[in-house]
Amino acid sequence: MKVSEFTFDSSTAHNKIFTRLYEPDGEPKAVLQISHGMAEHSALYKPFCEYMAQRGFVVVINDHLGHGRSVTSGALYGHFGEEGGLYNVVEDQRNLQSIMREKYPELPYFLMGHSMGSFIAREFAAAYGNSLTAVVFMGTSAGISTAMWKAERTYLNMLKKAKGARAKIPSLEKIATGPYNKKFKPNRTNYDWVTSKEEEVDRFVNDPLCGFPLTVQGYIDLGTLLYAINTDQWYRRVPKDLPILLISGENDPVGDMGKGVRRVFDKLNKTGHDVKLTLYPRIRHALITEMNSAQVYEDLYAFFSSHLPKAEEPVPEKETEAEPEVSTETEKSVENPAAEEEKETEAAAAEKNDDMPEENAEFPVI
């Protein structure tokens, strides 16, 4: 396989977006674009990218605005921009797709988003779903109520006025993700909720490009997108014939321990979408680093492969009985732990401010 790096211009016109590209040996089957989660970066996906490239997929993944090596001098980790927020990131995904389409114009095109990356992928699917062969929303969320979001937005705007849009306020991180860890007491770290594999948690904790808080504006942008992708309008905007896989752990607090992901699945189902659900018992948030990561890899590969063109399959000599229809909901058990896979770590330090808000009111988790 060939591994390369490049940058492209962000939709903000002020940033360069760092990107990793994995190209298989031989004739490629399809392109898979990956959208990573909050406070992480593209290098964490190296083992999965290599796995897919070894099976004939071109895989491309960038560092989002405010993340990884897309953060340059004068920029802030956890800041998506002064205007446009995460919708800028959605347009960056579209720009990257255009670049890959120029290179591979005829190949099937898949998109997979994890956590915050699934929020980005969900908006992409609503805006540009007709450009995709299929999409995976991994570790996604059913969002919060309108009343809760209004209260949260009011509080964040108060902080923005008092401290500034680019301020880093430690208490916001505790409010946003702190409750996730309460479900796994006693806690060894602040990130026990991410995965049940302690060595993977330690890698996340010790990676200077992971675990940083967003700016005040960053949390406003995140909440705005999360609310939008769980409205009735979003369900109407997503093409009904776009194949969708929802995949999550039943112990993932971002997905409300499976209940929130089921709500998204049920509503997609009721609105006539082509959707399947896979929930893994006893599994937490970061599926590709979990105890059952080998099974997750296989399931993702099987989903993408099932949507490749069938023209090259041999024609049976005689008509065979049709296979039973696959259920739109599938649950996987975790019996075979995955072999530990080494991830690439980039060395850099995230900017952190010590400003604390005068208010410390609790609001719903983003």
Regions found by a protein language model. Name each.
Residues C49-G74:
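Conserved alpha/beta-hydrolase
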Residues Y104-S115:
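Alpha/beta-hydrolase fold nucleophile elbow
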Residues M1-P24:
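N-terminal cap/lid segment of alpha/beta-hydrolase-fold proteins
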Residues E123-L209:
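Alpha/beta-hydrolase-fold enzymes
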Residues L246-S248:
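Short beta-strand/loop motif that positions the catalytic acidic residue
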Residues G81-R101:
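Alpha/beta-hydrolase active-site loop
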Residues D274-E317:
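Catalytic active-site module of serine/aspartate enzymes centered on a nucleophile-bearing elbow/loop
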Residues H36-E40, E250:
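Active-site glycine-rich loops that stabilize anionic/oxyanionic intermediates
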